[in-house]
Amino acid sequence: MTTMLEVAKRAGVSKATVSRVLSGNGYVSQETKDRVFQAVEESGYRPNLLARNLSAKSTQTLGLVVTNTLYHGIYFSELLFHAARMAEEKGRQLLLADGKHSAEEERQAIQYLLDLRCDAIMIYPRFLSVDEIDDIIDAHSQPIMVLNRRLRKNSSHSVWCDHKQTSFNAVAELINAGHQEIAFLTGSMDSPTSIERLAGYKDALAQHGIALNEKLIANGKWTPASGAEGVEMLLERGAKFSALVASNDDMAIGAMKALHERGVAVPEQVSVIGFDDIAIAPYTVPALSSVKIPVTEMIQEIIGRLIFMLDGGDFSPPKTFSGKLIRRDSLIAPSR
């Protein structure tokens, strides 16, 4: 690998001169600049990004930590798309770090981005507790924002969706449409989002005077296959239901396929709704009713807050978003 010293020898200048040319700091004649750039091109030299970052006041980068167990869903591809696009609009490069499979690995991913001198960092945590995240924020000077988790101490550093209330509202709409027997497919139960959506389902039943039937709850893993498996589990139990709520659209699509294969008509016999309102939802047959989570607005808010902090702005109150049920063909009133 070519070094800066080798570039300097090729250009016939000092190493310090090469450094000034590449950093743009200090006066260097145009003739000398041309010789240095020619030497760089001929030698294939690439500056050490980490070394440059160590001395720079700003790297024009934003970091994002997401655990790889969340990569498979369409929801997260849309999240990453919006994060990269909005970072670009702010003149920043988005750097992604993998939180992998544990709180310790999420912590290591955050430290990796800090070591790269990212100007600010976003975290979409799966394993770190809110107390651990608060401690991380307190320990570092770079702005750190948390997506989809409500913090206790550093509440202004969180942008989140109230999944419990959003789930409550969606289930309440089903009840108000006449549904009394409502099945629920959870996501992975190590996910705070899944726990909150299940809690919202239970609260909606309780508030409307409907007894909780555990036979109507099946655990999934966010995937279409687990949605189909959840339906098979419900039917094998002999569960009777006129509506089914899946904790994301991937599972809802798998559930509709399983119902179709079992000869259960959607929505005539069972109405189905999901969460996230992914791009394919209007194009399934029947078109999937889904709770739209305002991902674009959440990303816009979190990046806006990070840039505001970098510009010296004072902290703002926490920002809470809520979802909205988009009714399509998969949802009708139950047949009498």
Swiss-Prot record:
InterPro entries (alphabetical): Cro/C1-type_HTH, HTH_LacI, LacI/GalR-like_sensor, Lambda_DNA-bd_dom_sf, Peripla_BP_I
Molecular functions per Gene Ontology: DNA-binding transcription factor activity; sequence-specific DNA binding; transcription cis-regulatory region binding
Positions of the DNA-binding region: 4-23
SMART domains, alphabetized: HTH_LACI
Span of domain HTH lacI-type: 2-56
One GO biological process term: negative regulation of DNA-templated transcription
Protein name stated in the entry: HTH-type transcriptional regulator AscG
Organism: Escherichia coli (strain K12)
